[in-house]
């Protein structure tokens, strides 16, 4: 475990916040962190999650491909706080690969779902809502 730097520019405060949220979640057991931003844990049903902690305002499809190239076992991508999100294309790519893609507002609900990658919040009428963002021009 490191509290140093990582190639994704994720600050220690972002990592520490997510680490605390995961370790204190009632459905999480056997927690371990490595490579600074990778969190591995089991859920009470025995299923395993390999989560990458990011801090991306608008995570796009290219970044999902980068995650999977660098960390092929990742099955949960956390993009950061409530103000962060992802593009619709990134979400569709993750859904097609059974990979969870969420910001912090979606975190706790997803960890309770058997098919966590398919979790979504709903509006007052029961429609799915997602924190979609437009990718910033590079």
Question: Which residues fall in each region the model found?
Answer:
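Charged, structured surface patches that assemble and position nucleic-acid processing machinery
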Residues: 96-128
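Conserved catalytic cores of phosphodiester-cleaving nucleases, focusing on short active-site segments
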Residues: 39-67, 71-80
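Short, aromatic/basic amphipathic alpha-helical patches
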Residues: 87-97
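A diffuse structural propensity rather than consistent per-protein peaks
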Residues: 59-65, 87, 131-133, 137
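Phospho-regulatory, Ser/Thr- and acidic-rich intrinsically disordered linkers and terminal tails
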Residues: 33-38, 47-52, 121-138
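Short beta-alpha junction loops
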Residues: 79-85, 105-110
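Acidic-basic catalytic patches of nuclease active cores, encompassing PD-(D/E)XK
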Residues: 1-37
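Short, solvent-exposed polar/charged micro-motifs at secondary-structure junctions
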Residues: 38-42, 89, 113
């Amino acid at each position: 475990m490191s509290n140093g730097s990582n190639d994704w520019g994720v600050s220690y405060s972002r990592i520490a916040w997510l680490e605390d949220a995961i370790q204190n979640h009632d459905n999480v057991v056997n927690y371990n962190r490595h490579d600074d931003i990778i969190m591995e844990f089991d859920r009470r049903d025995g299923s395993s999650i390999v989560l990458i902690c990011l801090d991306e305002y608008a995570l796009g499809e290219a970044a999902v491909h980068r995650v999977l190239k660098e960390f092929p076992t990742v099955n949960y991508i956390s993009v950061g706080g409530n103000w962060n999100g992802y593009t619709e294309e990134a979400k569709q790519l993750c859904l097609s690969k059974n990979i969870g893609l969420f910001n912090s507002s979606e975190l706790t609900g997803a960890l309770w779902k058997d098919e966590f990658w398919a979790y979504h919040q709903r509006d007052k009428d029961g429609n799915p809502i997602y924190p979609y963002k437009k990718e910033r021009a590079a």
